[in-house]
């Protein structure tokens, strides 16, 4: 087989294996996908990950090779509602594990983390994703925010967080992604300015991963408590992060200037 054929076969094999243990990948194991239907678990997974930009009816017709008894759009929605988010996360994880990642300098995985926004079907009744009409949108729109991990050397996505557009929290997202990281090696998480915070830094350190997060000079000075930045690239600065603002609870009062408070909501 050619390499593309190996990749496709591997993907289908993982879905076959998942179909033999459905309880972990559906919302109601006692009821979901227990009857024989045209859109069973395997076909739903195949269809969703192979859909393109056409209308739902057109995608269904293509998938079933223009069969006259193609399932309806409502049947698709009904079956899709039975799938758990964990099904797609498991598929992505297992698929990546089948093909080892490329290492930078024989040791490091360079993992970029960034956010993107996507418009979804308009629904004014969903306050978590709906944005009111403004100068750019006459009728308003709904949006979700995604934060992805992308391995630069292998050019491959590793994981993803999806958040409602109005409830996005990139700090929490990157922490969740660090917690779920399973690919071993020596990862270096690389992120832009929107991810720089004490809590993210501490979370990376607690997870024993390296990180490179860009920040404005002004923010760096504020983070480190210095008026000017040194000229040399590597500088060691010791800080103590705390959840309490009470100085009486600080264990090292002699290092009071090194304490930095982290809000409990982060």
Where are each of the predicted segments found?
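Single, function-defining residue in the core of a domain
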Residues: 1-56, 62-63, 67, 71, ...
